[in-house]
Each structure stands twice: as structure tokens, then as C-alpha cells.
């Protein structure tokens, strides 16, 4: 398969084809089985996090170093010229990309990654999250994890639970899975946190089946993947939050009627939406999912920075 990802900006999931997603998943699996310590030899990657991050930043930096590359950058914008001296984001990007072979950026402003790609002088920009907009590399590790546990990306029943309105991870993953065949979605959320209309309209246009379900228990027996998210307390008053939260807590008891192959995923951090008794079940896979972030990001970096592998 030709590597169409070479020197490509990775800004949003809709801009990646099914073939490109499959190439990343395949490459992640190969790297997990057989480490490749020289794929980024003599390469420098700028890791610029204008917003707090733990898993994404550390997994990117681990991925770069395990491939033999070097990292420059920062994990807070507070001490940069952007914050201290009023430098524009466009100017900052132009300077930093002149030092590096790729530019990984997280930023609180929606559209910041797209802006960076316009001022990077051809250096590939990888979006590590831009506000509530897109988080494409989380989607890549999610896809790899689904493939690793199910052996396929077609013909799957997938449920998303919790905050489907503001959760950028569920938007991106829905758009990615919509590129595959035989996918059926279950959207389980309170009405105030329902999946946005534009996502449902995209699925309608593609003829992809989805159901709006009030209870997890109604969907669990049919599922291959149960993707949990945190309901954000700050969006509700105390009484409303208590009611909503209690309806979307997963326990080991909920999983008793589940298929043997069902895996529970979560972008983390969890608060109390997954009971700790789920951790000991064979369905729990969220910690392995987080670990897979290193392999998915290794695969992406290797493909973006190498014409052939």
C-alpha cells in the first residue's frame, strides 16, 4: 500500500481515508510486536502543548523517543513568547517548525491546528487536540484497540455512553468508524448531552444505522464495544447531576449479559462512571487502550516522516 501519509498534516479524522486509517492500524500492530528504534533517527519533533495534558503528551514523547527521535517543545505556554511577549500563534508556529521535522500541538482554541498547518512552511502538523473540535490521534489509538480486540473494523455494534455532546473523542471515533462497513451505533446519553445533530445527519446521509437508547442495559447484550465517557458535573446543578450520573455508571453487574468479546473502553481520566469492580472483568480494556496510544502515535509519526517503511 502506498504511503499517502508521508508529509501530510493530521488535523481531523474526516480528512483521512479508510485506507489511511487501516495503514496506521496495521503499522501500529507491527511496531507493537517488533519495536523499531531507528524510524525517527536524526529527526526532531516539536511537542508544543498550550493546554494541560498527561496521557497524550507523554505518549507522544515516548513514541518519539522509542523511534529514535528527539523532542523539543513545552508542556505549558505560560513561559513562552506567546504568553510573555504577545507573539502571535502564526509567528510562533513559523519559528518552531523551522527547527523541527514535525510539529505536534495541543491548543484550547478550536481551529488552532488548522491555522498552524497554514503557517508551518510545509512541516507536517499533528493535531493533539484543539478545543472541543478534534482529537484525531485519540481516535487512531481507539481504532487500533478495537481492531486488536475484535480482529476487524467492519461489522461491529458500538455504543457511546455519557457526554456525547461535548466529547470530541466520540465525535471523531464515530466519523472514523462510519468509513467502515456494517457498523451499528448506540448513543446512550441524557437528552441535554445527546450526540450533536451534525453527526447524526452525517450518519443518515451514509445510511448507517444508529439508535438513541436511554439505558445501557438495553444495549449491552448486542455490543462488541462499549465506549464510556465522563458526564461533566460543571454542566448541571447538583440535583440534576446526581440523577444523570447515577444512570450512567457501569458496574460489573451490568456486564453479566454481555457477549464474551465485549470490551469496555474509555478515553480517561475516569471519575466514577466505571465502577472499580469492572477492572477485574475480562471486558475491561481501558488501561491497555491508553498504552496503545504509544503504538498508534509511533505508527503515525513513522508514516508521516518516512516515505517508505
UniProtKB/Swiss-Prot annotation:
Entry binding sites for carbamoyl phosphate: 55-56, 106, 135, 138, 268-269
Enzyme class: transferase
Domain of life from the UniProt record: Bacteria
Pathway membership, UniProt: Pyrimidine metabolism; UMP biosynthesis via de novo pathway; (S)-dihydroorotate from bicarbonate: step 2/3
Binding site for L-aspartate: 85, 168, 230
InterPro entries: Asp/Orn_carbamoyltranf_P-bd, Asp/Orn_carbamoylTrfase, Asp/Orn_carbamoylTrfase_sf, Asp_carbamoyltransf, Asp_carbamoyltransf_Asp/Orn-bd
Reactions listed under catalytic activity: carbamoyl phosphate + L-aspartate = N-carbamoyl-L-aspartate + phosphate + H(+)
Molecular function as annotated in GO: amino acid binding; aspartate carbamoyltransferase activity
Pfam families per record: OTCace (PF00185), OTCace_N (PF02729)
E.C. numbers: 2.1.3.2
SUPFAM superfamilies reported in the protein's UniProt record: Aspartate/ornithine carbamoyltransferase
Keywords noted in UniProt: Pyrimidine biosynthesis, Transferase
GO BP terms, alphabetized: 'de novo' pyrimidine nucleobase biosynthetic process; 'de novo' UMP biosynthetic process; amino acid metabolic process
GO cellular component, one term: cytosol
Subunit structure comment from the entry: Heterododecamer (2C3:3R2) of six catalytic PyrB chains organized as two trimers (C3), and six regulatory PyrI chains organized as three dimers (R2).
Function: Catalyzes the condensation of carbamoyl phosphate and aspartate to form carbamoyl aspartate and inorganic phosphate, the committed step in the de novo pyrimidine nucleotide biosynthesis pathway.
Family per record: Belongs to the aspartate/ornithine carbamoyltransferase superfamily. ATCase family.
Name of the protein described by the UniProt record: Aspartate carbamoyltransferase catalytic subunit
Lineage, top ranks: Bacteria, Pseudomonadati, Pseudomonadota, Gammaproteobacteria, Vibrionales
